[in-house]
């Protein structure tokens, strides 16, 4: 069930679902697994807010275990494409593809709540259902390219050498807010009274 907010306006009462009300304040909630439908919704909101006023920041709250690489990269590319600065605020967790999205916020405007967590690791993949050796080889090569691409993005976003990111992402690597700050994925640990 999605909560509804009722506001008094000059014309009487207006009711909004909570996400529409937050969107009026340029707040987007990226929660749950990253998949195509969710990514399309996030992208549409980013484009709408940028078209509405590209001089104002957009606030992207992130709480995700990660998910689809292609869906996540579509969000990242849109964040980089629009003119509005995108503040990212990690609450709960940003794991896997979520770290790529959250760390791609505008530098200087990437935040994390004190008890949130970050997790980087190498991408997972399969053979795409093919059982032929050539299909498996193609899938393995694609997975390596994907890993290199994601590690380059994480290196660029954190300021760490790609070799360090490669080693650190070999297995699930969980980080506290302080460790995430020291790594360079965020710019500040946000106190609860700083939230928009």
Curated annotation (Swiss-Prot):
Record carries keyword Protease: yes
InterPro entries: ClpP, ClpP/crotonase-like_dom_sf, ClpP/TepA, ClpP_His_AS, ClpP_Ser_AS
Family of this protein: Belongs to the peptidase S14 family.
Subunit-structure text: Fourteen ClpP subunits assemble into 2 heptameric rings which stack back to back to give a disk-like structure with a central cavity, resembling the structure of eukaryotic proteasomes.
Protein name per its UniProtKB record: ATP-dependent Clp protease proteolytic subunit
Swiss-Prot/TrEMBL GO biological process terms: protein quality control for misfolded or incompletely synthesized proteins
Gene Ontology MF annotations: ATP-dependent peptidase activity; ATPase binding; serine-type endopeptidase activity
Reactions mediated catalytically: Hydrolysis of proteins to small peptides in the presence of ATP and magnesium. alpha-casein is the usual test substrate. In the absence of ATP, only oligopeptides shorter than five residues are hydrolyzed (such as succinyl-Leu-Tyr-|-NHMec, and Leu-Tyr-Leu-|-Tyr-Trp, in which cleavage of the -Tyr-|-Leu- and -Tyr-|-Trp bonds also occurs)
Gene designation per UniProt: clpP
Enzyme class: hydrolase
Physiological role: Cleaves peptides in various proteins in a process that requires ATP hydrolysis. Has a chymotrypsin-like activity. Plays a major role in the degradation of misfolded proteins.
Organism, scientific name: Streptococcus salivarius
Keyword tags: Cytoplasm, Hydrolase, Protease, Serine protease
Record-linked Pfam families: CLP_protease
Subcellular locations according to the entry: Cytoplasm
Main location (coarse class): cytoplasm
Active-site residues annotated for this sequence: 96, 121
GO terms under cellular component: cytoplasm; endopeptidase Clp complex
EC number(s) reported in the record: 3.4.21.92
